[in-house]
UniProtKB/Swiss-Prot annotation:
Protein name, as recorded: S-adenosylmethionine:tRNA ribosyltransferase-isomerase
Record's subcellular location: Cytoplasm
GO biological process: queuosine biosynthetic process; tRNA wobble guanine modification
GO cellular component entries: cytoplasm
Assembly and interaction partners: Monomer.
Function: Transfers and isomerizes the ribose moiety from AdoMet to the 7-aminomethyl group of 7-deazaguanine (preQ1-tRNA) to give epoxyqueuosine (oQ-tRNA).
Gene: queA
Amino acid sequence: MNVKDFDFYLPEELIAQHPLEKRDTSRLMVLDKETGEISHKNFYDIIDYLNEGDTLVLNNTRVMPARLIGEKEGTGGKIEFLLLKRVEKDRWECLAKPGKSARVGRRFTFGDGKLKAEVVEVKDNGNRIVEFYYEGIFEEVLDSLGEMPLPPYIHERLEDRERYQTVYSKENGSAAAPTAGLHFTEELLHKIKDRGINIAYVTLHVGLGTFRPVKVDTIEDHEMHSEYYHLSKEDAEVINATKKRGNKVISVGTTSTRTLETIADEDGNVKETNGWTNIFIYPGYKFKVVDRLITNFHLPESTLIMLVSTLAGKEHVMNAYEEAVKEKYRFFSFGDAMFIK
């Protein structure tokens, strides 16, 4: 299948640069995956599409302020590191900018010396393995010195860091937010629970690969990046019981979806586990556990629009995106939402 089949026209002004004042007032496009019928709602109306006994699956990862800007020891030359994943206690795989400054053995300082770093390895893909030196707890040091790694298409400064976190974020480790979850408020989640709808959590730490363009012509030739996931025994039992009852599993976001589909066996059962996934879901894939999906509007030719098209049908999804552009929906991380029912 050709990557170009997932291209669409998107005016730049529809790329949301900031979140709405109230999370759940974003617009919601409801797409019937069987008929292709579209309705236009607000996100707080999502509760009307969930039934007692259904389970909503949320990704509780938390975005780290993983962008560090510092100086090279001795010369004062600027360096920027973006932390991607921890490889040992104080060693992280990072992107470095400018790369030529980040050679093995080079040392850097951040925040008046509160944090120091040394490049210990350059990987084949150009990423650096960096060892950090500090006093106290690394996460607290990072919290005081780091900046949020916003997506490349967001050009405005984010005034409130928490607006790039879900209200239920808990497990530190992501380089990007699981953006479908940004629409939920604590009040809306309480209302959902009060209606007898279950809430289960997965953890998938979103990597920067989520923003990387597909650089091949044929979908089947694309290789996905790997991301760490975890599912607890308790949450696995809630999901399995939902399927057994004949209720629906509604996945919030492509990250929750990829986690569940990685873990599920052929009968759609999930179990407590953790690991790394590079699952690539594109048309032809048969879903094992996810019945419905809440998601944002994604980039043209992205692996995310391919996943959405797998659940709802490519023709239905491309028609829906055309309608979203016509109706001036807001796109990408801080944009509006779609519910595939």
